[in-house]
Amino acid sequence: MHFRIRKCPNCGRYTLKEVCPVCGSETKVAHPPRFSPEDPYGEYRRRLKRELLGIGRRS
């Protein structure tokens, strides 16, 4: 499935274009990524996030 609607991170406008027609900045996909309970890369993504934020693992 290909999502078409996009959102400008600067002015908050929604558009179908890759560049915001109002402020000219690059738009981002407005939809969150799909969730899967069997996420094969979830452990690695969480580990990287903890390392980048300097958060220790709770015991």
UniProtKB/Swiss-Prot annotation:
Keyword Glycoprotein: no
Highest rank taxon of the organism: Archaea
Biological process annotations from GO: pseudouridine synthesis; rRNA processing
GO cellular component terms listed in the entry, alphabetical order: ribonucleoprotein complex
Signal peptide start-end: none
Gene3D superfamilies the record matches: H/ACA ribonucleoprotein complex, subunit Nop10
Swiss-Prot/TrEMBL keywords: Ribonucleoprotein, Ribosome biogenesis, rRNA processing
Any one GO MF annotation of this record: snoRNA binding
Bridged cysteine pairs (disulfide): none
Pfam family, one: Nop10p
Function: Involved in ribosome biogenesis; more specifically in 18S rRNA pseudouridylation and in cleavage of pre-rRNA.
PANTHER family for the chain: H_ACA RIBONUCLEOPROTEIN COMPLEX SUBUNIT 3 (PTHR13305:SF0), RIBOSOME BIOGENESIS PROTEIN NOP10 (PTHR13305)
Family: Belongs to the NOP10 family.
Annotated protein name in UniProt: Ribosome biogenesis protein Nop10
